[in-house]
């Protein structure tokens, strides 16, 4: 290794890495510099030395990129949640398309050099797009603060005005923190596993309805807090409590109870309505979700005699968009509340050709196949960990004719394509910017079974 810890070096940034950092070479050593942009010449200090690379802190930019902008967020550097806010937005979209190429070059699925990778679809107004927040709460001398941990630490950043967060949910979390302090509710700390740990607030774009979850290590009396919140925020329709007494980093425990209001809120996507219970997964960016799901529908190109499996179905949002166009839809999800929502949503919409089960896709789909069911269309929308090996093997043994992979992690997507391209051709990859100003992107992949 040609560098040592705390060494200060000049560096030319050759490209950007998948996490939004600048990458350069110093005496043939690969150096990652968060905050640096392609084409810049910087002065940096080595902060970490690994076997094959080093990380450095940006000290000074000697030659700025013409694509650099001043981040409009006052806590941009301190927070670290928006890794590329200093990059002009149209160039962010180019970067996200390139991230897909980088992932493919690393894993090299069959034929990757010839894949059609379409330009990333961005937002016309890439601010205040997050309709859901999950803020940690901590008490500092009796003063309750809510926010996120600084990147790579357990140091809470008090966030009062987040540029990418929905304005109403931000206003509500600010008030929640005040009320938790006012009524002296116990607040979690890592020495005493007791009190309120996290607050989740989600607003439905279509209805404007809001739901709130207090994640706490024990049962508490939230009556006074709820009374004030309901009086001040007429949009608030659901208040729930989730009990998580574990010492793990898991946000949620197994028990969720609605303590005030209705069981769910109402949302819409692709011109149909559905319900969201407090624990159910739904995309963070409702406006771009319309585009993401439209691209998925277009890519799968179903026929009326198709039997469709919607793996990782959540509340049924993607699958229900197909239900009126196919013979049947089957879906599964690991969250029982989401499956209950999916069943109720299908019933509400009048569909009788749907079937939903709670459980893992890698367990349920092989069982369905062993029972004689066959799907000729498959859509998967897995978590960031990608597809389970067991599910991949099932797909290889009995591949549906057509498949769409909706990915939230380009690395696991490229990894899974190594397996999937044994039986499928990749027609194209369409990325959609669901998280402006961050290094993350989502992608819709159209796959067709090989003849």
From Swiss-Prot:
Residues that, per the record, bind S-adenosyl-L-methionine: 283, 312, 333, 381
Broadest EC class assigned to this enzyme: transferase
Keywords: 4Fe-4S, Iron, Iron-sulfur, Metal-binding, Methyltransferase, S-adenosyl-L-methionine, Transferase
Domain of life: Bacteria
Binding site for [4Fe-4S] cluster: 73, 79, 82, 162
Annotated InterPro entries: MeTrfase_TrmA_AS, MeTrfase_TrmA_CS, NA-bd_OB-fold, SAM-dependent_MTases_sf, TRAM_dom, U5_MeTrfase_fam
Similarity comment: family membership: Belongs to the class I-like SAM-binding methyltransferase superfamily. RNA M5U methyltransferase family.
The keyword Metal-binding belongs to this UniProt entry's keyword annotation: yes
Domain TRAM: 2-60
Active-site residues annotated for this sequence: 408
GO molecular function terms noted in the UniProt entry: 4 iron, 4 sulfur cluster binding; metal ion binding; rRNA (uridine-C5-)-methyltransferase activity
EC number(s) per entry: 2.1.1.-
Protein name, entry field: Uncharacterized RNA methyltransferase SAG0413
GO biological processes: rRNA base methylation
SUPFAM superfamilies: Nucleic acid-binding proteins (SSF50249), S-adenosyl-L-methionine-dependent methyltransferases (SSF53335)
Organism: Streptococcus agalactiae serotype V (strain ATCC BAA-611 / 2603 V/R)
């Amino acid at each position: 290794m040609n560098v040592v810890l705390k060494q200060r070096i000049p560096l030319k940034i050759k490209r950007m890495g998948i996490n939004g950092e600048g990458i350069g070479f110093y005496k043939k050593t690969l150096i990652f510099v968060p905050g640096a942009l392609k084409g810049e010449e910087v002065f940096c200090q080595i902060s970490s030395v690994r076997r094959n690379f080093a990380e450095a802190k940006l000290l000074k930019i000697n030659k700025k990129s013409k694509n650099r902008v001043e981040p409009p967020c006052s806590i941009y550097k301190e927070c670290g949640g928006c890794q590329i806010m200093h990059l002009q937005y149209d160039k962010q979209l180019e970067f996200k398309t390139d991230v897909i190429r980088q992932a493919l070059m690393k894993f090299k699925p069959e034929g990757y050099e010839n894949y059609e990778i379409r330009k990333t679809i961005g937002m016309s107004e890439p601010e205040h797009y997050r309709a859901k927040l999950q803020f940690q709460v901590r008490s500092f001398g009796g003063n309750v603060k809510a926010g996120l941990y600084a990147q790579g630490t357990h140091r809470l950043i008090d966030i009062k005005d987040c540029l990418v967060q929905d304005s109403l949910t931000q206003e509500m979390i600010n008030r929640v923190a005040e009320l938790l302090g006012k009524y002296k509710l116990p607040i979690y700390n890592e020495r005493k596993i007791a009190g309120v740990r996290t607050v989740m607030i989600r607003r439905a774009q279509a209805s404007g309805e809001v739901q709130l979850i207090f994640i706490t290590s024990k049962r508490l009396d939230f009556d006074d807090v709820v009374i004030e919140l309901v009086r001040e925020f007429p949009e608030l329709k659901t208040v729930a409590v989730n009990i998580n007494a574990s010492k793990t980093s898991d946000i949620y425990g197994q028990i969720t109870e609605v303590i005030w209001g209705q069981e769910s809120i109402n949302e819409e996507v692709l011109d149909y309505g559905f319900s969201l219970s407090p624990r159910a997964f739904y995309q963070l960016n409702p406006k771009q979700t319309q585009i993401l799901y439209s691209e998925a529908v277009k890519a799968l190109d179903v026929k009326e005699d198709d039997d469709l499996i919607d793996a990782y179905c959540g509340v049924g949002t993607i699958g229900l968009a197909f239900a009126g166009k196919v013979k049947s839809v089957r879906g599964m999800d690991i969250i029982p509340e989401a499956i209950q929502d999916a069943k109720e949503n299908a019933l509400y919409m009048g569909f009788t050709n749907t079937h939903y089960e709670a459980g893992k896709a890698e367990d349920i789909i092989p069982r369905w196949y062993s029972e004689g069911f066959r799907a000729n269309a498959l859509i998967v929308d897995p978590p960031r960990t990608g597809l389970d090996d067991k599910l991949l093997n099932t797909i290889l043994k009995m591949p549906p004719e057509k498949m769409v992979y909706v990915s939230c992690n380009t690395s696991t997507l490229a990894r899974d394509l190594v397996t999937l391209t044994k039986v499928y051709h990749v027609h194209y990859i369409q990325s959609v910017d669901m998280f402006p100003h961050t290094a993350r992107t989502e992608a819709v992949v159209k796959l067709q079974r090989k003849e």
